[in-house]
Amino acid sequence: MQNFEDLFTYQDGIFLTWMWNTLFYGIVGTAGMTLISVACGYGLAMYSFRGRGFLMGCIIGSFLVPGALLTIPSFLLYTDLRLIDTPTAIIVPSFFNAFSVYLAKVYAEGAIPHELLEAARIDGAGEYRIFFQVGVRLMSTGAATIFLLGFVGMWNSFFGPLVFLRSSEKWTVMLGLYSWLTVKHDQTVDLTGMVVVGSIISLIPMVVLMVSMQRFWRTGVSLGSLK
């Protein structure tokens, strides 16, 4: 119990700040990534246009580029834009995820019949209305999966915050707990015990998210059986 008390009081309760930061980065960044990925995947799956195959090849090819390879160019760019040590440096890059776009495209191809879109067009619906009222609803299970994978990635992010964030008040929970492990022995508290307790507490949002997403997957299975 002493570790729990120390965890929430050490350094003026900075652990709660790290938890809030990570939750904020995760929700905002993953929500933007999900919307962009679903829109791009829907467009690639439902529309035929010149260069679609080349564009899809570029998306798949980007899987081969190590994220660490882009660290220095990204750092220089963010420095020029004065984004270092700001939430923007963590949130905006998470909006664009090639794997999520690919996943959304594959799911849209199997979940959305072209005949349904044609029927909506005949009824006078515009493309934006079709996307939000038809496409998004039919892709809800895929969107939930993309959101879950993205949020878990953001929650466990370490390298990006380590490079782009300097102020400890803006760190994520993973980076903050790691910093406690690298601190010299503190005679007042048991930092190792606090890290263990903090790691356990940091799992709670993941469990809550997993449970809350169950209804989307159940809905997807039901729709699939009805088809």
Question: Could you say what each language-model-derived stretch is?
Answer:
Residues M1-K227:
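A structural signal for multi-pass alpha-helical bundles of membrane permease subunits
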